[in-house]
Every structure is written in structure tokens, then in C-alpha cells.
Amino acid sequence: MKIVAKLLVAAALLVAPASAQTAAPFSASVESSIQSVLPRMIAWRRDFHEHPELSYEEVRTSRVVAQHLRSLRLEVRTGVAQTGVVGVLRGGRPGPVIALRADMDALPVTEEGDLPFRSRARGRYNGQDVGIMHACGHDTHVAVLMAAATVLASQRHNLAGTVIFVFQPSEEGAPPGGLGGARRMLAENVFGDLHPEAIYGLHAWPQTSGTVTMISGPMMAGSDRIDITVTGSQTHGAQPHAGIDPIVASAQIINALQTVPSRQMDAVGSPVIVTIGMVQGGVRYNIIPQTVQMQGTIRYLNPDTRERLYERIRRTVTETAAATGATAEVTITENAIPTVNPPALMARTRAAVARALGEDHVNSGLPVMPAEDFAYFQQAVPGVFFFYGVNPPGVTQAEAAPNHNPRFFVHEPAMETALRAMLAVTLDRVGGEQR
């Protein structure tokens, strides 16, 4: 596309070597292909960043991806989970099947900053006109996986196995009542008649550029949505005794819910977060309303505690409401299950990445409470998910804008680290003499 062609020259001038150069180099042929694709990878990323698309609206993104995969002579399926793309690369020799996944959707965020390729896109979200931005780094995920496909396709005759490239829509969340991208792709038989023995994914994270973070076991939280309706009895604001005040009840419920993680669950063995992010009630300053609506999110790391957590939340909400004379209805909807990296597979993955980047560029870490629907792929296939750092040199995690922030920033040379990590885990499985 024209925008990609224009950006290639600029990207070629600005791409700098990642700080994590290979400790144990890839074969000369692989290394040559890596160096060749780096300017294109940056150009793809800038193109996607300038043209972000919301969940299940990734029409342009998926078209660019599919055209590129076809140019590599991969088997390509489009329209998987509406806008998803799947490419299959068959090596020259038989061997295992693995899958690599990247998510494609952007967020309803208006970008701030002065990047020459910053997003000016707008769209509709929840009935509102919104800015659209790749504020979570998915533009880099897509570009890195396209680059990985390019390198691996150049080595197809030396590969012993098959690689499935999964470009997933709607990681950030489906419309109410719908399925997110990972679950929908699985429901639509994303792998066809292939049976991958492992799947890998990564995510841009505000940590040191040139490093990756590998977390064994629970890595990211499960995420559920909570909807609460508190019903009282409407009355004049000057006569609260004549009714039941659902606003006061909702305030007490919000406070009481904070005892669930701190007093009702094991804070060490079963860390939990309960956040109420929306409260809506009343239409006039001197009327106590009939109802109050609340919405929030629940986060947890231990799948075994989920039902107990639900029970404690429902009990806390309904009994706190009852103490004020009000009633409360609670609905909890699953958004994502915890992302859990199998220790044995993580150990193999970490070793492969350390050989490629150097041990000092591979970090361990603690679980984090954001969620990621890659976990549903892990239910179907053993899988590993890891972070790659995108902070510019000298910028700490505390100083960097977090994911979902209008100033979220990716230090582009970090993408080479991500590419090398993905190639390392792939060639460890299907590389034969190319690993």
C-alpha cells in the first residue's frame, strides 16, 4: 500500500539495532533475512498505528496482513471470527505443528503526543464518537508477526514442521453478550485440521527496551464484569425516611466490596481486585431515586478461587443492601480467564529465548492484574505468553505511560527483540539445523 511504501525509506533510516543482539547467532541465512525485514516491520507498525481499528472492525488491518501472507505463498484463511486471518507455513520436512498469535484491535482512546504517524482516526464506541488509538501495542504485535512470517517463509525448505500464524481480532473485548476474539476463533476451528503442540504470544509492556519478561505459572489475571442494580424506594430528598435510599446503599456496597479482597480472600494465595468503575443513579438533585446501577471489574489469579470469590461478592452486595432496606441484583459475566504459563514449557521457551538474546536480556517477574484472552488458546493448546519491553533507554516503568494511556509509547528498536524472541521459540520447535 502507498503509506507503507512511503514509510519504508524513513523507517530504514531510523531503525537502530536492538540492545539485545543475539548471544548465539541464528544461521547466516536467518540473520540476513532478519536484517532485511527490519525496515518493513517498522513501516508496517507505523501504518497500523496511523490507521487503528476497533474490535471486530479490523478490516483494513486484516486486508494488509492477508495480502502479505499470500505474497509469501502461505495458505491463508480470512474472515475467521469476522476479521481474523490465519496463515499456514508448511516446512520442507515433516515435524511438529506450532502456532504464533498476534492481536490486531485498537482502543477507544484519543492519542496525545506529536508522533508524525499518530492516529487521527475516529469511530463509534458504545454510542459515542471516540478517538481510536493503538494504546496497547497491538500494532507492534501484528508487525512483529508479519516479520516473523517473512523470515520463516524464507527458510521454509529448511523447516521441519508447520507454523500457524494467528492474527486475532477483538482481544480488547467483544460487544456486550458477544464472544471475544480468541474464544470466537476457537469456536470457528481456527486451526482447521492441524493440531499444534504449542502456541506462543507476546505483549508490549512498559519495561526496559531490549528485554523480555518470562513469568512461569499465573502471569495475568482472570477478568470478569460485575453489574449491580440496587433498588430502593423513591422519595423526596427532604423526606428520606419516607423511602429507601439506593444511593446510600450503593455507597455502602462499594466500601463493603473492598473487604472481599482484604478480609474475605487469602491476599497471598488468592490475590483479588474488585473495582467499581461506574455508578449511575438519579435525575434530579432533590429526588432520591428508585434505582442505582453500578458496573465494575473483578480480577483474580487463581482459577480455583473463582466460585468462592463470586459467592463472597454476591453475599456482600445483597446483605449490605438488605441492611439498608434496599435490595440488590448481581450479575457477573466472564471476560477472560487467567493466563497461566505451564512451567515445563516456559522453561524450554526461556532457554530458547536466552540463547538468542543473552541471559541478561531475559527477566523473571511477578504476575500482573490486567487480563489477556490468549488464555483461551492455552485452554486448547499448551501455550506461553511473555512481555517484551518497549520503554526508551533511561525511562523507567514508573516514568513511562502505561498501556491504555493516550501517551503510550513504543521504542521501535525494541521490536527487533520481540522478533528475535518469536523466531527463537519457533526455530526451537521446527528449525532443525536453522535453530
Model-identified regions with their sequence ranges:
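Acidic/His- and Gly-rich active-site-bordering loop/insert found
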Residues: 22-133, 143-161
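Hydrophobic h-region of N-terminal signal peptides that target proteins for export
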Residues: 11-19, 37
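Hydrophobic beta-strand positions in extracellular immunoglobulin-like domains
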Residues: 89, 230-232, 298
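Histidine/acidic-residue-rich, glycine-tolerant segments that coordinate divalent metal ions
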Residues: 121-133, 139-140, 151-152, 157-278, ...
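Sec-dependent signal peptide recognition
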Residues: 2-10
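Metal-dependent amide/peptide-bond hydrolase catalytic core
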Residues: 21-25, 71, 248-435
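Divalent metal-coordination and catalytic microenvironments
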Residues: 48, 87, 100, 138, ...
